[in-house]
């Protein structure tokens, strides 16, 4: 199957699979979909609460986005829904601009994702450096962790306390630590212990579901004074309904930055999840179709009252381990959650808030990637470590928009510095090598000078062109460009200045082995016509021979 094809992979599976193959696989996908729904249920509720919205909105997201992305997506096994990466972003948007702002930002993100897919930009995600993704992921993990301490300890804040930013949350924690509720701590610790130890008991039943059941049972059984979801939220059961909030052009303009952030994060998370899944099932996803599906799924989610969604690595891994191999598993997972929403959602009111906090603490720990973080700090270059730490810090102190923007800017600057340092300009008068261009030792006439440029000629290194000099007796200057893969406008300007310098000193300029892109740039700039087509020689031997011939003709003419 073509990786860059803009066609849902489900359609290709149905078209190219035999009836016998489908008959064997579909039952496995149905079972896997049910298992994944069990995993997704507590996570969807917990992540919705962490995002500052109602618990049922997490299920809306898993149902609508989960179904649409599975149906239209480019991955066989991707499971999409609310993820921890979006929690802090969504919470900030909802706190400042309400659900209308979130809808506007997500629609912007959805349109961007669809366009990215249709324009086949899926492969561009690989240009986001590992240091940036590691830094902001660890930063998000810290913000989630800080945000759950209040509920884990059962703290009580005075009315009007603002806790949107991480720094505000830390200040509020310090100011109200004396209000700790030890009964809430007990529930939270028990649930954390279950989450850590349950995988040793059973890998089939998710520990988060067991923690929810045990936590919900502890509060009434022991008469504990602990806040539950029902104490803080109004639970709404029933089918999600299509909503069209009033959105103004000004609101879309205000939410543009948030929309771009959601789109970038959704693209990175979803395609990373696809890559991880591909490595397990030995398959290949269609990155561009996956982006289109993510865009449609996100727009559908918010129009049905949900929040942004993306591919969830943990749920996708659960799908793979359970035998899911087609998008039918993701669609079944959404259908099962829909049944839970309609018939069992009122029971979610019994879940204690410390249980939700415990689940999110485990999510934060798992997504932090602290081992990779520490490994990078110990082994990466100083520039890479600086980018990592700065992205991490800015994510916590400010927001993801600032972190990614600054991180990418620093990465680009460091990359240009590295490339410019690798570009060299060196002169020679006698040179020998054994490459395919050279078959003999080069002896240069005294009046011929050669400079060799190795590396891309762009604005980061053009100052080195000014280091080229000629002697009083120099008549011909050969610029060997076989090691120049690319030439930009600033590099072109440097060559024009070099030409003027040579003209002022009575020196003829010759170019040797200009590669395709630099040659095309010089032609477009009119530089080839200025210097003369005959002065561009195919290799260094030909250039030296041309200079020698010109010198001989000048001597005869004299």
Regions found by a protein language model. Give the residues of each.
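Short secondary-structure capping/turn micro-motifs that flank functional sites
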Residues: 335, 518-519, 538
């Amino acid at each position: 199957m073509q990786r860059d094809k803009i066609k849902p992979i489900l359609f290709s599976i149905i078209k190219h699979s035999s009836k016998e193959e489908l008959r064997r696989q579909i039952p496995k996908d149905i079972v896997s979909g049910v298992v994944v729904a069990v995993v997704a249920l507590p996570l969807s509720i917990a992540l919705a609460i962490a995002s500052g919205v109602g618990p049922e909105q997490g299920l809306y997201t898993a149902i609508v986005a989960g179904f649409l992305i599975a149906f239209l997506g480019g991955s066989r096994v991707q499971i999409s829904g609310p993820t921890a990466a979006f929690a802090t972003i969504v919470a900030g948007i909802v706190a400042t601009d309400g659900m209308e702002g979130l809808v506007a930002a997500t629609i912007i993100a959805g349109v961007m994702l669809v366009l990215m897919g249709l324009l086949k930009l899926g492969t561009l995600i690989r240009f986001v450096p590992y240091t940036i993704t590691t830094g902001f992921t660890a930063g998000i993990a810290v913000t989630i962790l800080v945000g759950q301490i209040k509920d884990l300890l059962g703290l009580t804040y005075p009315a009007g306390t603002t806790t949107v930013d991480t720094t505000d949350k830390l200040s509020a924690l310090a100011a109200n630590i004396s209000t700790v509720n030890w009964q809430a701590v007990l529930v939270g610790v028990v649930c954390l212990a279950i989450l850590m130890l349950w995988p040793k008991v059973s890998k089939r039943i998710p520990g988060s579901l067991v923690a929810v059941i045990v936590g919900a049972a502890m509060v009434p059984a022991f008469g504990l004074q602990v806040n539950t979801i029902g104490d803080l939220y109004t639970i709404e059961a029933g089918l999600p309904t299509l909503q069209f909030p009033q959105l103004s052009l000004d609101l879309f303009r205000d939410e543009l930055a948030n929309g771009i952030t959601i789109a970038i994060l959704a693209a990175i998370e979803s395609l990373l999840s696809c890559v991880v899944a591909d490595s397990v099932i030995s398959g290949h996803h269609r990155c561009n179709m996956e982006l289109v599906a993510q865009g449609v799924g996100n727009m559908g989610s918010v129009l049905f009252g949900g929040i942004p969604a993306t591919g969830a690595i943990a749920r996708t891994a659960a799908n793979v381990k359970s035998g899911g191999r087609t998008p039918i598993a993701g669609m079944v997972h959404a259908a099962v959650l829909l049944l839970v929403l309609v018939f069992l959602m009122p029971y979610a009111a019994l879940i204690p808030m410390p249980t939700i906090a415990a689940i999110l603490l485990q999510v934060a720990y798992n997504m932090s990637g602290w081992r990779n973080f520490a490994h990078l700090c110990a082994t990466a270059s100083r520039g890479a470590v600086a980018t990592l730490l700065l992205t991490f810090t800015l994510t916590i102190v400010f927001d993801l928009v600032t972190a990614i923007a600054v991180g990418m800017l620093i990465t680009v600057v460091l990359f240009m510095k590295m490339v410019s340092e690798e570009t060299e300009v060196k002169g020679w008068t006698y040179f020998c090598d054994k490459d395919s261009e050279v078959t003999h030792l080069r002896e240069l006439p005294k009046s011929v000078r050669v400079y060799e440029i190795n590396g891309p000629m762009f604005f980061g290194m053009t100052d080195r062109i000014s280091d080229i000099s000629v002697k009083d007796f120099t008549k011909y200057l050969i610029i060997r460009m076989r090691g120049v893969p690319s030439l930009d406008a600033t590099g072109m300007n440097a060559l024009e200045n070099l030409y003027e310098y040579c003209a002022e000193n009575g020196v003829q300029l010759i170019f040797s082995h200009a590669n395709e892109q630099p040659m095309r740039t010089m032609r477009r700039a009119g530089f080839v016509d200025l210097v003369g087509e005959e002065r561009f020689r195919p290799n260094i031997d030909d250039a030296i021979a041309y200079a020698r011939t010109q010198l001989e003709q000048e001597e005869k003419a004299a």
